[in-house]
Amino acid sequence: MVTPLHNSRPRRVAVLSVHTSPLAQPGTGDAGGMNVYVLQSAIQMARRGVEVEIFTRATSSADAPVQEAAPGVLVRNVVAGPFEGLDKQDLPTQLCAFVAGVLREEARHEPGYYNLVHSHYWLSGQVGWLARDRWGVPLVHTAHTLAAVKNLSLAEGDTPEPAARQIGEQQVVAESDRLVANTTEESDQLVRHYGADPNRIDVVAPGADLTRYRPGDRDAARATLGLDPRETVVTFVGRIQPLKAPDVLLRAAAELIARDPASSLRVLVVGGPSGSGLARPDALIELASSLGIAARVTFLPPQAPDRLADVYRASDLVAVPSYSESFGLVAIEAQACGTPVIAANVGGLGVAVRSGETGLLVDGHRTEDWATALQSLVSEPARLAALAAEAPRHAENFSWEHTADGLLESYRMATVNYNYGHGPSEFSPRRGRGLWKLRRAGGVRA
């Protein structure tokens, strides 16, 4: 039997990140903001005396079984399926192998080695509730993205999330002892689309490494990147996929240049391939050429954090035109560096950006609207400077230290309400009730 924790703070947490490693380079493949979130929050929890072991699927034969990411933070690479060539959509076929690897590691230790499970993304949640039941400890889950929400705002030509994912998410929501949402809007989405109990949801905002992402010398940053100091640089940072909508920025830039051919606008695209449709960097290059702005667009591969900070500092404006974002770490990182953000008015971007104070939110994705919004900023240097001055002050509200504190409070709530030795308490979800909801919704047949 697992002994309850007297101070309600776990000694050691098993963090599950099945589909992407926290050590992977953000901006390519399936690596993005979630990778940064998992690693940075783990580092901060370790600094607070909580050991963290992150389980992820091995994607190379060269992956060591265990890697130390930071003091108190281990990454365990679980062999589950082929190392390469397995699409994220096919990962459910390897969850049994992944679960076996996780349970096998725990079995090497005395009972109670892990005090809590924290799963990230629905695939990890499927593993998480099995580990929770096996070990008799609470499960906390962070969705990061939700199929029901993504499918409501698909980019043209993008592939809808499959029904199997939404059913899987419904199960995880029903099974979790606590749910962590990035914003109150995401909390509302969990209730509205998945029937989550609002009393089990904790809103914990992601953060940024404010020691790394801070204002600096713009000319020096441009010299480092080989950018002309006389140009107006608008930057996109992220995976090149329809969801992130880099094409929206390119089309708006082309429209703006058509309106003002003497414009000094330069578009900087920083990221690697992912997803479907406009996922290949060369497809975006072809789009720039077809729009007649190839000479005005610079492409860079994903950048290491210190170099990425220079990218933000070198930019006059950072664009986040996504069709869906649960938060938008790029927006916070850019503002922390003193760079205003122009973003789509979707999801958590309404929290990450203070429209009119640290940047501008744009409704919809029409080329004309984005071009006009861009023009309103780049044509008014004084306005842009005022936004830039306020941006770092806003970003100070979002740090990984704050995120870790919020997560630890969620862990405390999960722990005090967990009925050790007897499974979930009356305040926690039960598997039967969750599946009953699914059957009533027609998602699962009895």
Swiss-Prot record:
- Gene3D superfamilies recorded for this chain? Glycogen Phosphorylase B
Q: What is its EC number?
A: 2.4.1.250
Which InterPro entries does this UniProt record tie to the protein? Glyco_trans_1 (IPR001296), Glyco_trans_4-like_N (IPR028098), Mycothiol_biosynthesis_MshA (IPR017814)
User: For Mg(2+), which residues are the binding ones?
Assistant: 312-313, 315, 339
**NCBIfam families associated with the record:** mycothiol_MshA
Q: Name one GO molecular function term.
A: D-inositol-3-phosphate glycosyltransferase activity
Which controlled-vocabulary keywords does the entry list?
Glycosyltransferase, Magnesium, Metal-binding, Transferase
- Reaction(s) catalyzed by this protein? 1D-myo-inositol 3-phosphate + UDP-N-acetyl-alpha-D-glucosamine = 1D-myo-inositol 2-acetamido-2-deoxy-alpha-D-glucopyranoside 3-phosphate + UDP + H(+)
Q: Which cysteines are joined by disulfide bonds?
A: none
Protein name listed in UniProt:
D-inositol 3-phosphate glycosyltransferase
What are the BP-aspect GO terms? mycothiol biosynthetic process
The EC class name is transferase
Locate the residues binding UDP-N-acetyl-alpha-D-glucosamine: 25-26, 33, 239, 244, 303, 325, 333
Q: How does it assemble?
A: Homodimer.
Family note: Belongs to the glycosyltransferase group 1 family. MshA subfamily.
Role, per record:
Catalyzes the transfer of a N-acetyl-glucosamine moiety to 1D-myo-inositol 3-phosphate to produce 1D-myo-inositol 2-acetamido-2-deoxy-glucopyranoside 3-phosphate in the mycothiol biosynthesis pathway.
Q: Name one Pfam family in it.
A: Glycos_transf_1
Is Metal-binding a UniProt keyword of this protein?
yes
Residues bound to 1D-myo-inositol 3-phosphate are: 19, 30-35, 88, 121, 145, 165
Entry annotated with the keyword Nuclease:
no
